[in-house]
């Protein structure tokens, strides 16, 4: 007997489906196509980091200009350095970097810092002219950088004259390429005043003002010409005009304040001169406030305040301002020297020894805190020991050496009576002529 197989009760017999096969083929072909597109870069894989757009030279330059106007010159320099990194063949960018580097040297304290920054400015301007030898703006900026390098605190008289000669040639070349270049006219006037060609300098800067009186540089240089000619009130007026254009450029406030202080010196009675001194302090205080607002720790305004109070005979507040400057730059040997001078003038001779020693010979550990006017270091209060490298002697720092030697000699500060120690004191007192006393008393 034949028995038929039983049909499955709960499962279907497997069978092929043409639609399912077609779907698999489409998916496989689609996957192959996607892999090919990914290899070509047409399609990006999922979950990749969001691409960051590449910044342009113009973007960095705009950032640099904004930082310059805000008074943040170091940030402006960094932005322009990024700009020339992105496009190293842009002559205008190199020239603008050189201009900011030159101005930024005015915010530095020590001669080596200033010299290094100014040499960087020359390098940037050289690069600009190398890229665009017939660009009037590049030659004008190079004249500016060369003129500010012509400083007898850095170089010999012969070297200074060489810098001034080269600066004059660059300014004339800029005017030859574009006789309507207002900046070139202004920088040429600045070179001429440094060459003591006063009448010619005044003619050129007035011509620059007639062409364009909207430039900070033009008013700054006119103020410089006027103060060199002893017209301090008019110089202050021009600095005020420059400040109106660049209100966060604290260097201008310091120059205007210094002119008020110079006017005060011409008044024989200190009390009669006090209102003029107070005007100078107003400018310095504004510079301090601007630096606080933009987060810049610049010792310059505090040192200007200290000099003003020192001239008024108010040595305690003068010393406090120098100590504030040292909080910003605790390893700056020049600031220790300025504190030592104030202690000396206030007859705190013992205190002046510690500060002047740090300035001249250098100091470290507890001595560095004593050099800042402290009894000892107080790490809990942020008064930590630092290493201070002594300064080399230079024409505008010789006062530190002179006074240090005088105090050591007067107080018999040798800890022993050895011939070597006594001989050292004698060398200190013989090293400087007597006429220096009256000169350094101011």
Region roles according to the model:
Residues 57-58, 91-92, 136-140, 182-183, ...:
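Helix-start (N-cap) detector for alpha-helical repeat units in TPR-like alpha-solenoids
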Residues 55-86, 103-114, 187, 194, ...:
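Alpha-helical segment of the N-proximal tetratricopeptide repeat
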Residues 73-74, 107, 111, 118, ...:
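TPR-repeat structural position
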Residues 65, 99, 103-106, 144, ...:
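Residue-level recognition of tetratricopeptide repeat
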Residues 76, 114, 121, 160, ...:
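Single-residue signature of alpha-solenoid repeat helices
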